[in-house]
Each structure stands twice: as C-alpha cells, then as structure tokens.
Regions:
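Short, structured secondary-structure boundary patches
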Residues: 93-97, 221-225, 266-272, 339, ...
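Generic preference for hydrophobic/aromatic residues in regular secondary structure cores
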Residues: 132-137, 174, 329-332, 408, ...
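Iron-sulfur cluster-binding cysteine motifs and their immediate structural context
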Residues: 285-290, 321-344, 365-392
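Ferredoxin-like iron-sulfur electron-transfer modules
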Residues: 298-318, 347-368
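N-terminal small/glycine-rich loop or linker at the start of catalytic domains
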Residues: 163-167, 342-347
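Iron-sulfur-cluster electron-transfer modules
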Residues: 161-165, 351-478
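Noncatalytic alpha-helical scaffold of FAD-dependent oxidoreductases
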Residues: 1-249, 254-295, 299-300, 304-328
Length: 478
C-alpha cells in the first residue's frame, strides 16, 4: 500500500505527495530525475558465518550481534545452507547441515583497526557460548568475504537453476517481529510443504525481521495455478492474521500482493489509499491493478509462463546478473533480454516485427565472449546459444566457406595482408576520402568492405621456427 505516514510526517501538500510517490510504484506519478546522497563506506570489514542447530537458537544469538553494532545480519535456513554445494569452493560441508538448522551471516564495518581486532576476538567467543559454530572463524579478506556473501546473493538464482525446466520462480518478501521468526519459519515451511513447494528456501535480514522465501512453481497447468493461489492465501493469513506482520518490507506490492492490501491495513486506511489514487489518477491510467486493485483475483491472472527455448538457456531466472558485463548492453540487448525475447517468440506472444529486429539486436551484435557465464549464478553462456542460432541460420554455402577458411587460415591472413597493402597504396593515389566513397558503394553490393583511413599497414608474417630443440617449457615475459 501507500506510505500513509507521509500524511502526518509532513504539512505541505507537495511534500506529502512527493513522499507518497516514492513508494507508489508508478501508480500516482513518476520521478524523472532523482538526486541520491551517498553513505559512508568504512574501509575495514570483518564477517562470519555462524551455524546453529535451530532457528530459535540463531535468533537467541541475534542480540549479541546487534548490540555490538553489526551492520548486516542475514538468517539462512537449512535449505538455503545446502545450496552452498553448487559453489565452486563451498565454505563448509553441506552434508553436515542438519534438518531445521539455521545460520547467521553477519558483517561489521569499521574505521579503526583496533575496533576490528576487538570484534574478531570477542564475537566468536560470545557466539560459541550460545551454541554457535563458526567453520571459518572471522574473515576480513575481501576475496573470502565475497565468497561468503555469494551464498546469500545466489540463493534466488540457485533455486532457479534446480527447478524443472519450464517452471518459474517466486520470491516473496515478508516482515515480522524478529522474536517471532522461529515460529514463523517453522509454519512457513509447513505451508510450503502443504502446497508442494518442496524446494523452498527461507532467508532474510534477521535484525529487521525481514524474511524472503524463494521456490519454483509450475504455472503451465490449472493445478499449478491453484497451488500458487493457495500458497499466497495461506501466507497472507499467517503473516497478517496470526503474527500481525507485513506482507511487504522492501519489495514492491505489485500485482501479487495488491488483493491483500485491504486485509493488512483495514477498510478505513484502504479507502484513504483509494482516495489518493483517484485524486492523482482518476482514470486509472498509471499502472492499473498495481498496488491497489478491485479485482481480488488479479494475482492469479495473466501469469507469466516460461516457454522452453533451448537447453542452454532454459534454466535462466532472468535475475540480470549478466547485464553489467555484457559488451552490447548499451548498443542493443543484454543476455537476459535475448533470452526473454526468445521465450516470447517460443510462446507465440511476440509481434512479427520482433522477429526481424532480433536478427540484428539479438544475434548479430552478441560478442559471444562468455562474460555472461562468469557473472551468471547458474553458469549460463548466452553466447553459446547465439552461436547455435547463427549456425542454424547459416546457409550451406556459408558453412562451406567458413569451414574452408578455418582450415586455411594462413591463406586468409595472406589475403588480408594483401588487401591492406593494396588499400594503403590506392589511398596514396586517390586519397582517403575518395577511396572511402568508392568502397561505400562496392560494400553495398558485397564486393568489398568499406575503407577506413585509420586502418593499419599490413603486418609482416611471423617467423616460423622449424627446428625443435626439445625444450619442455617456454616462458614468455611481456
């Protein structure tokens, strides 16, 4: 729902409205420009992962970390901890994780060395007294810290990678009094089991009482849609009805929780929200049925399917971790966008114009360098998929030519050197601008590439060493 506290926190109508817009998810207006303040990033950090036999014992240890000023405390249930088996170098043995156990992943950020030294001595001792086990102790090394954080960071995509192909992934965001978390986690697990979400993992920001859970779901059948609806209904009853919690903490309400806003806030506050909406957007043009809705079934309508595309990319959960490293992200598409468009095409949802545009945007501009695989939590190389696409669309003549060229590359190099030498010689006679104009036309009919004055001179052929003196190793120093 809307952040109604803005009505009592501010007096000027513009201030009130501006603060309502911030959490309104585009249903009242939008900000075209935002200035953000930066926050302090202390240079010294230390962290640890402490394992407990139960969620209750992990929560009992939470005040120790909070009172010492922990900047982050994450809770991981037993299913979350077992996902470490998919890491390249897991920090602990996942086979030793007991049922119903839990862990706290915590970090301290400081400016002084003596503060870090104090914490690395006092925290392990205090947590051990409360039944905790720190398999790695306290860690200050950046590379090791990143590896620990990858357990938490990769939970959502890891669940996605283990799911059956063609299914989707749901992640929800709930908030409770942190003292209720042991009971909440236990009952959430029962709800997931009841609705056959057996791969669900539960984790969250422990000191804030903020829980997330992620699970795979099959939306390709009526039964799958009913199980999804049942899960959300029971989750709402547990959160609001039993524990007086909130159905949203840091994620947006969206369409998934819109039918439950009145249930959480009551009729009076819900009516105020609708009055605000009707004043700002009387025709309901802005994001209809998002955050507020009169359709109590909107969360189970127009559900997004996951059509099968290719074994290379079907496990993609569209998390977007690949996007920052993609060379073509500022030009055409990212790996995630390439996969999403292919799913739209496979499902028959795409406009015909998309098919034409995808040839250049999706296929021709992909660098196929595999950087996306390095960033991807489930090791998807979209470039491999694009190579398959290119091969599928290649003509027989094209395959023969490329195959011959690959097997006669020294001759291709000879031709390239000759072409550069001829181009440079012609440029001296005709001039660079004239040659560029001529080759622009020859390029259009496929006779030559377009000339560029900045092309280098042809390099000399590398010397070939024919004698073998039996050296086992050859070192190169740049």
């Amino acid at each position: 729902g809307y952040s109604l506290n803005a009505i009592i926190d501010y007096k000027h109508p513009l201030d009130i409205f501006a603060h309502l817009i911030v959490g309104a998810e585009g249903t009242l207006a939008f900000f075209s420009d935002v200035v953000l303040d930066t926050i302090d990033d202390p240079p010294l950090k230390t962290m640890g992962l402490v394992l407990f036999d139960s969620v209750a014992s992990s929560m009992a240890a939470l005040p120790v970390l909070v009172n010492e000023g922990a900047d982050a405390v994450e809770m991981l249930d037993d299913a979350s901890l077992r996902t470490a088996q998919y890491l390249e170098n897991p920090p602990y043995d996942h086979l030793q994780i007991l049922d119903n156990s839990a862990a706290l992943l915590f970090e301290f950020q400081k400016h002084q060395v003596n503060e870090i030294e104090h914490l690395t001595q006092s925290i392990p001792h205090a947590l051990t007294l409360m039944g905790g086990r720190l398999p790695l102790g306290m860690i200050s090394n950046d590379a090791q810290r990143l590896q620990l954080w990858n357990i938490r960071k990769g939970l959502y995509p890891t669940v996605g990678s283990m799911r059956k192909k063609g299914t989707s992934v749901i992640t929800e965001d709930l908030c409770y009094d942190y003292r209720d978390l042991p009971k909440v986690v236990s009952e959430l697990k029962l709800i997931c089991q009841q609705w056959q979400y057996d791969d669900a993992v539960i984790f969250g920001h422990a000191k804030d009482g903020n829980l997330h859970f992620a699970a795979s779901m099959d939306l390709n059948s009526i039964d799958g849609e009913k199980r999804f609806e049942g899960l959300l209904n029971d989750m709402a009853k547990l959160t609001v009805g039993k524990f007086d919690g909130s159905l949203k903490a840091e994620h947006g309400t969206g369409r998934n929780m819109a039918p439950f806003v009145e249930y959480e806030w009551g009729g009076d506050l819900y009516n105020i929200m609708w009055k605000i909406k009707n004043l700002a957007d009387p025709n309901s043009i802005l994001n209809p049925d998002v955050l507020l809705t009169k359709d109590n079934k909107t969360h189970v309508k127009n559900l997004k399917k996951m059509p099968l595309v290719s074994d290379e990319v079907d496990l993609c959960v569209e998390c977007g971790f690949c996007e920052p490293v993609c060379p073509s992200k500022e030009i055409t598409m990212t790996p995630r966008q390439r996969i999403v468009v292919q799913r739209e095409i496979a499902g028959g949802y795409a406009d015909p114009s998309v098919l034409d545009a995808f040839q250049y945007d999706g296929i021709e501009t992909c660098a196929t360098d595999g950087l996306c695989e390095i960033a991807c939590p489930v090791n998807i190389n979209t470039g491999t998929f694009v190579k398959w696409f290119r091969q599928k669309n290649e003509s027989t003549i094209g395959k023969l030519i490329s195959g011959w060229a690959a097997n006669h590359f020294s001759f291709i190099q000879f031709l390239a050197r000759g072409g550069l030498s001829m181009g440079k010689a012609t440029q001296k006679i005709l001039g660079g601008p004239a040659l560029k104009v001529i080759t622009r036309y020859t390029n259009k009919i496929g006779l030559s590439p377009q000339w560029n004055e900045k092309l280098p001179y042809a390099s000399k052929p590398l010397l070939t060493i024919k004698e073998n003196h039996g050296a086992q190793w050859v070192y190169f120093f740049g």
